[in-house]
Amino acid sequence: MQKLIVSFVIFTTPLAAQAAGFGLAEQSGSGLGNAYAGAAAIAEDASTIYSNPAGMTYVLGTQAVGALHLINPNAEFNDDGSVRAAPRPLGKEGGNAGNLAFVPNMYFKTDINDSVKFGIGVNAPFGLKTEYDKNWLGRFQGIKSELKTININPALAFKVNDQLSLGFGVSVMYAKAELTSAVNIGAAERSSKVEGDDFGFGFNFGAIYQITPDTRIGASYRSKVEQKLEGKAKSNFTALNLIPTRTLNTDVTADLTLPENISVSAFSRLNDKWDLLGDVTWTRWSQFEELRIVRDNGTNSTLISTPENWDNTMRYSVAVNYHYSDTLKLRAGLAYDEGAASTAFRTVRIPDNDRKWLSFGAGWQVTPSTKFDIGYAHLFISDTDIDDNQLAPVAPSPVGKGRVKGEYDASVDILSMQVTHNF
């Protein structure tokens, strides 16, 4: 199990999350073409284990699903009045903070009997990576910020009757985080790195109700996962002897709450050719009030404290499917995804903002037992203002982190591929 987790985390290197905050929406390849509209109701394949486990009652027989998402983000910072951290030079704009990323998911579902279904999913519900040039003007606020997760999610589904299905699952989630930055000590610059990891536990449940033979609605809930990341803080201050090494090279802890969400979806087969899908999802990002890292060396003093004060978010999506033939289905979708960070508290580590999704995709039934899905989405991200003022207080304090003031030009392209096989 440990080898599986390490391999998955190394392979899963998401950039800035493609849903609000540091959430990852890419949990199935078939759903991307619909911008994940109707995810809690469509129950198209075993990836429903994540979006709504009740949907397993709609998936026939034993099925395995494997998906891979290629995420290509762009996030260019444009300076508009930043101020250096005296006495250090200002530095450059930082280049593209985005990084090409690959995100996989895997699902397996089978029948226990006609009414009870079992499945298990392995995916990455949250992730973040921003990385700037080491000499950029915001280096004292952050250079590299990375969060990786892996979620193992066994689930059961029950067909209560011809109209109602229920599902329940549990989650074992591993999280690993790394933060790096430059440190201004007046006489020179030095670097610091903080990293830690932990396991956390949560659950999910959902229901699907078949209103008519062609129309159903679904609702699902995923719980928060609370973790206490434990790790190390490291720096290269020793040569200057300006700050006691024990305060900078030390064990650290940080509380991390990965938020709960609620989704309500609808799916309707309008006629032999067209399907209509919709979804509304609420996520409780307001729990992310502060990024606080504490020394675990007996002092319990604060090493890093950054106010975040995020807002809860809504995501709205709508989509259509066109059944071109018995073996080919075409998809299109739109979504509006609210950002969790406001301008007043936006940081260089997570320059989050609202997103608009435009998605296309197709599903091809290659053989009676094997299906291939492909999807593409472009995310239009609103112009993202930032004014992170961490200038030093009035003398005699000789140090500070400077002021990062400007705007991000950002967008994301996502390509997903999925293979589904029935045994």
What does each model-identified segment do?
Residues 39-44, 49-62, 108-113, 160:
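Outer-membrane beta-barrel pore proteins
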Residues 12-16, 68, 362:
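Residue-level signal for alpha-helical transmembrane segments in multi-pass membrane proteins
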Residues 1-19:
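Gram-negative bacterial Sec-dependent N-terminal signal peptides
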Residues 20-35, 39, 83-93, 100-423:
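Outer-membrane beta-barrel porins/channels
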Residues 23-38, 57-76:
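Transmembrane beta-strand segments of Gram-negative outer membrane beta-barrel proteins
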Residues 9, 59, 286:
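Active-site-proximal flexible loops/turns
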